[in-house]
Amino acid sequence: MMKDEVMIKSGVVNFVQQGEGLPVILTHGLAASLHDWDDLLPELAGAGYAGYALDLFGHGESHKPADHDEYTFDAVFEHFSAWIDSLNLADPLILIGHSLGGGLSLQYALLHPERVRALVLVNPFYDIRQLPPILQIAFRRKLLDTTLLEYLPYRVFRFFVDMSSVNFSIGQRRTHVMPKHIRYQTALDYTRAASGIYNIPRSLPNLIPELSRIQQPTLLLWGNRDQSLNPGSFPTVEQKLANVVASHTFPVCGHVPHQCHPEQLNPHVMEFLRDVTLKA
């Protein structure tokens, strides 16, 4: 795996690249990092794809402006799009996006359809109305002073990550739906993210009216216990997109099925990519 940085107009982009072949762009969600894809990247490389995963604007080791007003969906998209341009990839892209990364992937397909071969959407965030009502109010009215989050230690984030991972189902042997190393990385990513990123959801465009214009083959995957986004919102994407060739739900998983059960999710991705590339 090659770790690299590139300087673009909107600042440094930290990313990793693994494998050779058709390009696959992997994009994480809010308050996460490129480590979301630590399980999928090696599989892609082993199957003959070139996987590229970045830290989004304000996340991980990428550019983090001090001014919270700079954190908008458009700014994140510009940073993401300029990074893709910097890679100088000749082949059309396969876009894999989780949550906010799914919204960015959809927006990229809308604006640059000729550059996109296929889409894989994991619990995609495409409309602020997917959030629980209390979070919609908080994000829209800027009730939260997110600067305070910068002073919270790792152990506080780890406590909330661990609590959200507990499996309360009767008869389940596992106490957590996410492995320990994933919970560690998730909490660490929260501490590394700029506090301004929580301003991004309020500027998220409602993509629903535009989705029917996306013609590329799409795989839709989601966790049925998502507490961050309404799981009932994901079938809307399936109905609106013109070419969803397959979809699958993961009953035990919440917002991050790619980390909850990668051994179950990754085969769906790899099968979809094989079908897409065979038909190309």
Language-model regions, residue ranges each:
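Alpha/beta-hydrolase fold catalytic core
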Residues: 1-25, 46-49, 77, 85-91, ...
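Conserved HGGG/HGGXW glycine-rich cap/lid loop of the alpha/beta-hydrolase fold
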Residues: 16-63
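Active-site loop/oxyanion-hole signature of alpha/beta-hydrolase fold enzymes
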Residues: 56-96, 267
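Gly/Ala-rich beta-loop-alpha elbow adjacent to hydrolase catalytic centers
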Residues: 97-101, 105
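Flexible "cap/lid" loop of the alpha/beta hydrolase fold
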Residues: 110, 119-150
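Conserved alpha/beta-hydrolase catalytic His-Asp/Glu region
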Residues: 130-131, 152-213
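Conserved loop-alpha-helix segment in the C-terminal half of the alpha/beta-hydrolase fold
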Residues: 213, 218-253
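Catalytic histidine-centered segment of alpha/beta-hydrolase-like enzymes
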Residues: 253-266
